[in-house]
């Protein structure tokens, strides 16, 4: 399925139904009073998250969503039916903005979360409500309310436990393919991965966590070079960052520092997230390779997705980080301060 992480749609809540102008007409009641019923309320527009959705692709094909209109009131004080609500399903991690003002309306991160986006118009009141001692036969009703309309911008930020970050050809796609059932495109040239991929890693005792393979970052990604700016936002919601550098890349310490620098330029709070340094492709590592400590407090693991070297230790470390209750606290605190 094609991955789409932004979309714009137009929603229209239903108008209310008209109030009825009617008078009671029965045998032996020649001068019955007003009995016009109220119109029904217009349908609301709701957004609801669905954890099974991972893309905004559907909104590229359908951009207009209309709720039902309330039916009109009738005589004998009969109230019209409310218009049908419409529920639009979106992936978890969807940020919803007013397209006109850019104001964030909702940030939907929990499965099955439901948010009212546009209110239906109220039903007009029938003439039964307007009789007075001096106006016993009102020949008018209250006009119905209009349903709210809104243009919405959706931005999807993937919900994953671990985000794999690295330069093109660092081995991210190969790693996620051997750790999970994900099957991203893999080839020996840069930018094979053009969209993020999600994989579920099965751990011992029926535990599991989600890993996201983010398309390769290059130097200058925070300024829009390569594919970086388009996809860096997908690591904002991850709990743990796994920073990958290839053993055959030359200066792995410089590459690691460059990756951290690009993330800091995009959002300095990302560096508050717990991270793991991973040296990949150890099966083709130079014989004289010396793996540095990179930085204090960061676990460094050397792995090979081809031979399986270090993968068990990597899964263990990822699980420890993901299951830590305070794993994302510093990052969230800083985001709230901003």
UniProtKB/Swiss-Prot annotation:
GO CC, one annotated term: cytoplasm
Main location: cytoplasm
UniProt-listed InterPro entries: G_OBG, GTP-bd, GTP-bd_Obg/CgtA, GTP1-OBG_CS, GTP1_OBG_dom, GTP1_OBG_dom_sf, OBG_GTPase, P-loop_NTPase
Cofactors (names): Mg(2+)
Chain segments carrying region Disordered: 121-145
Entry binding sites for GTP: 166-173, 191-195, 213-216, 280-283, 304-306
UniProt cross-references to CDD domains, sorted A to Z: Obg
Domain named Obg: residues: 1-159
Subunit structure: Monomer.
Protein name (record): GTPase Obg
Organism: Chlorobium limicola (strain DSM 245 / NBRC 103803 / 6330)
Gene symbol of the encoding locus: obg
């Amino acid at each position: 399925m094609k991955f789409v992480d932004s979309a714009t749609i137009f929603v229209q809540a239903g108008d209310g139904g008209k109030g009825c102008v009617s008078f009671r007409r029965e045998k032996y009641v020649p001068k019955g009073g007003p009995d016009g019923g109220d119109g029904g309320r217009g349908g609301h527009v709701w957004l609801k998250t669905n954890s099974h959705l991972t893309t905004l692709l559907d909104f590229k094909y359908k951009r207009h969503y209309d709720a039902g209109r309330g039916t009109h009131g009738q005589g004998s004080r009969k109230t019209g039916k409310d218009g049908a609500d419409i529920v639009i399903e979106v992936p978890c991690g969807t940020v919803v903005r007013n397209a006109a003002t850019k104001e964030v309306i909702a940030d939907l991160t929990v499965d099955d979360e439901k948010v009212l986006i546009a209110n239906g118009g109220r039903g007009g009141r029938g003439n039964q409500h307007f009789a007075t001692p001096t106006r016993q036969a009102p020949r008018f009703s209250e006009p119905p309310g209009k349903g709210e309309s809104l243009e919405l911008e959706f931005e999807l930020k993937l919900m994953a436990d671990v985000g794999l970050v690295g330069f093109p050809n660092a081995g991210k796609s190969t790693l996620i393919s051997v750790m999970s059932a994900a099957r991203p495109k893999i080839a020996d040239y840069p930018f094979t991965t053009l969209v993020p991929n999600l994989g579920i890693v099965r751990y011992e005792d029926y535990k599991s966590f989600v890993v996201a393979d983010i398309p390769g970052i290059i130097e200058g990604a925070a300024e829009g070079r390569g594919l970086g700016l388009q996809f860096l936002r997908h690591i904002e919601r991850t709990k743990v960052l796994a920073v990958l550098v290839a053993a055959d890349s030359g200066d792995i310490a410089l590459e690691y520092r460059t990756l951290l620098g690009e993330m800091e330029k995009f959002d300095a709070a990302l560096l508050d997230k717990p991270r793991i340094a991973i040296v990949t492709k150890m099966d083709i590592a130079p014989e004289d390779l010396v793996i540095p400590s990179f930085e204090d407090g960061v676990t460094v693991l050397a792995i090979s997705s081809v031979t399986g070297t270090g993968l068990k230790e990597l899964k263990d470390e990822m699980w420890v980080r993901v299951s830590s209750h305070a794993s994302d606290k510093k990052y969230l605190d800083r985001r709230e301060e901003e």
